[in-house]
């Protein structure tokens, strides 16, 4: 495969669960080393060639690096995205801040066992915006020197994406964005924002397709911060029963058809979950279900949509 043409697979293995316990519906905890490698092997065998990780995800980068080390012949075919950040309290000048970003990047490259990271992202938009000059210089230099192929940011809100669009007209150094999108959260469709991001040439990754597992929880056992989600989950479960479409199938199919991203992140703790996700993705939703989902979940309270508020 020509390295210039390397792109993510339609599903990306979100590897945060491989490095730490993650997700409100996580019942299995973090897999051990053997189980993590089995998940990576199964993902590759089933056609997933892109992995998403971050320096902040515990053992995740190192475990992906162990997979790469065992399969050096696959390195040129893998699309690995990782993220880096400095502590928000860091008060270095721009040049020193850039140097610190390079140090973090080198640590990630070493952990991943790669000479070049296909996609390196700023983990927090607020950091990127606050230290724009340092990040702009860092991304440009990292690309020029062959440390990274593409640069991007992980976003939370449409407002952040709108600002990225404005900034990109002045300094078009960003290539990819990671955004939340799911059955409850369609904010990026408003004002044709998703279409604008695509038209601007951004590679788009969708995360939180299961809203960090919230879609699978019982409405009767929610923590107090998520009480507003209870009626939504009841309606979702009813819709699943009425149509005979499973929640995974519905969530993945909706994201695929409604948002049409370059790739959808899926996070798993077991090989069984991985297989269930892959099987669900291969199915397509029955006619009319997209519109019914749009109508049923047109008004979702903002606190339900943002895991940072849970």
PLM features: what roles do these ranges have?
Residues 45-48, 114-117, 148, 174, ...:
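A structural motif
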Residues 1-78:
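N-terminal binding-site loop/beta-alpha segment at the start of enzyme catalytic domains
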Residues 28-42, 94-112, 158-167:
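Short, acidic/polar
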Residues 109-130:
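Active-site groove signature of glycoside hydrolases
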Residues 20-34, 87-99, 124-129:
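Active-site mouth loops of central-metabolism enzymes
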Residues 7, 67-79, 109-114, 141-143, ...:
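Acidic (Asp/Glu)-rich catalytic clusters
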Residues 125-295, 304, 310:
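Beta/alpha (TIM)-barrel catalytic core signal, keyed to glycine-rich beta->alpha loops juxtaposed to Asp/Glu
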């Amino acid at each position: 495969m020509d390295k210039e043409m390397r792109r993510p697979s339609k599903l990306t293995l979100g590897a945060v669960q491989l490095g730490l316990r993650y997700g409100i519906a996580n019942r299995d905890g973090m897999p051990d080393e053997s189980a993590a490698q089995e998940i990576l092997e199964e993902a590759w065998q089933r056609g997933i060639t892109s992995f998403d990780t971050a320096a902040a995800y515990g053992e995740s980068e190192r475990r992906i690096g162990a997979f790469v080390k065992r399969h050096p012949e696959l390195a040129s075919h893998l699309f690995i995205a990782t993220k880096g950040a400095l502590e928000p309290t860091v008060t270095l000048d721009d040049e020193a801040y850039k140097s610190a970003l390079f140090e973090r990047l080198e640590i990630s490259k070493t952990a991943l066992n790669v000479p070049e990271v296909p996609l390196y992202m700023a983990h927090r938009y607020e950091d990127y915006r606050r230290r724009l000059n340092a990040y702009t210089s860092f991304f440009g230099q990292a690309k020029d020197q062959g440390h990274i192929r593409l640069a991007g940011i992980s976003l939370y809100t449409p407002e952040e994406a709108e600002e990225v669009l404005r900034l990109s007209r002045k300094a078009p150094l960003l290539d990819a964005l990671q955004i939340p999108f799911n059955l409850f959260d369609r904010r990026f469709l408003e004002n044709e924002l998703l279409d604008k991001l695509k038209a601007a040439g951004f590679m788009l990754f969708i995360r939180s397709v299961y809203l960090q597992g919230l879609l699978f929880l019982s409405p009767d056992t929610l923590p107090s911060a998520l009480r507003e989600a209870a009626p939504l989950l009841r309606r979702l479960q009813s819709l699943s029963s009425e149509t005979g479409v499973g929640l995974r199938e519905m969530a993945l199919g909706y994201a695929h058809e409604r948002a049409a991203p370059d790739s959808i992140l899926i996070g798993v703790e077991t090989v069984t979950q991985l297989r269930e996700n892959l099987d669900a993705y291969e199915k397509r939703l029955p006619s009319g279900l997209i519109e019914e989902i749009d109508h049923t979940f047109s008004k979702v309270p903002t606190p339900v949509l943002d895991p940072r508020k849970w």
